Amino acid sequence: MQLVVARIGRAHGIKGEVTVEVRTDEPELRLGPGAVLATDPASVGPLTIETGRVHSGRLLLRFEGVRDRNGAEALRNTLLIAEVDPDEVPEDPDEYYDHQLMDLDVVTKDGTEVGRITEISHLPSQDLFVVERSDGSEVYIPFVEEIVVEIDLEEQRAVIDPPPGLIDDRAEVDSSDTEAATEADA
């Protein structure tokens, strides 16, 4: 199974190093010297990590065969993909790999069906579940413990306790706003 572990950013210096946006909780395992990674786009790789270091809080990598700034710039925005055993699980029981969460059914605490996880977006502040509803629309659920209260891999579901307005249909939210305004005027 393949897992996106990083995205290559800008070139750093003139000797072929690049900045890397890490997308794994185990960078020392997945992004160490000697690691061979597939790429997206595939035509760029595979890439073998030659060296890695942290500079000003950013991970810098150099790949075999990339010796100058031009070569490094050509790699910009390339996704780095590691091969992962599908049975491998994170050490922390409250951590999950993307492939474990994909296609989970999402329900509220009271059992109301919301939809199915179709994508996980890794943003700087938090991860987001992209959930496809039965009508084909999408809703975005922040993957934070205050909202996602349970992940049950055996039952293939994620239980959420959404704040008002997070998953409500726009029409329902608009009608409750109108009702509240009417009551306030009375």
From Swiss-Prot:
<dbReference type="InterPro" id="IPR056792">
    <property type="entry name" value="PRC_RimM"/>
</dbReference>
<protein>
    <recommendedName>
        <fullName>Ribosome maturation factor RimM</fullName>
    </recommendedName>
</protein>
<dbReference type="InterPro" id="IPR011961">
    <property type="entry name" value="RimM"/>
</dbReference>
<feature type="compositionally biased region" description="Acidic residues">
    <location>
        <begin position="174"/>
        <end position="186"/>
    </location>
</feature>
<dbReference type="GO" id="GO:0005737">
    <property type="term" value="C:cytoplasm"/>
</dbReference>
<dbReference type="InterPro" id="IPR036976">
    <property type="entry name" value="RimM_N_sf"/>
</dbReference>
<keyword id="KW-0698">rRNA processing</keyword>
<dbReference type="GO" id="GO:0005840">
    <property type="term" value="C:ribosome"/>
</dbReference>
<dbReference type="InterPro" id="IPR009000">
    <property type="entry name" value="Transl_B-barrel_sf"/>
</dbReference>
<feature type="region of interest" description="Disordered">
    <location>
        <begin position="160"/>
        <end position="186"/>
    </location>
</feature>
<dbReference type="Pfam" id="PF01782">
    <property type="entry name" value="RimM"/>
</dbReference>
<feature type="domain" description="PRC barrel">
    <location>
        <begin position="93"/>
        <end position="166"/>
    </location>
</feature>
<dbReference type="InterPro" id="IPR011033">
    <property type="entry name" value="PRC_barrel-like_sf"/>
</dbReference>
<keyword id="KW-0143">Chaperone</keyword>
<dbReference type="InterPro" id="IPR002676">
    <property type="entry name" value="RimM_N"/>
</dbReference>
<comment type="similarity">
    <text>Belongs to the RimM family.</text>
</comment>
<keyword id="KW-0690">Ribosome biogenesis</keyword>
<dbReference type="GO" id="GO:0006364">
    <property type="term" value="P:rRNA processing"/>
</dbReference>
<dbReference type="GO" id="GO:0042274">
    <property type="term" value="P:ribosomal small subunit biogenesis"/>
</dbReference>
<keyword id="KW-0963">Cytoplasm</keyword>
<dbReference type="Pfam" id="PF24986">
    <property type="entry name" value="PRC_RimM"/>
</dbReference>
<comment type="function">
    <text>An accessory protein needed during the final step in the assembly of 30S ribosomal subunit, possibly for assembly of the head region. Essential for efficient processing of 16S rRNA. May be needed both before and after RbfA during the maturation of 16S rRNA. It has affinity for free ribosomal 30S subunits but not for 70S ribosomes.</text>
</comment>
<comment type="subunit">
    <text>Binds ribosomal protein uS19.</text>
</comment>
<dbReference type="GO" id="GO:0043022">
    <property type="term" value="F:ribosome binding"/>
</dbReference>
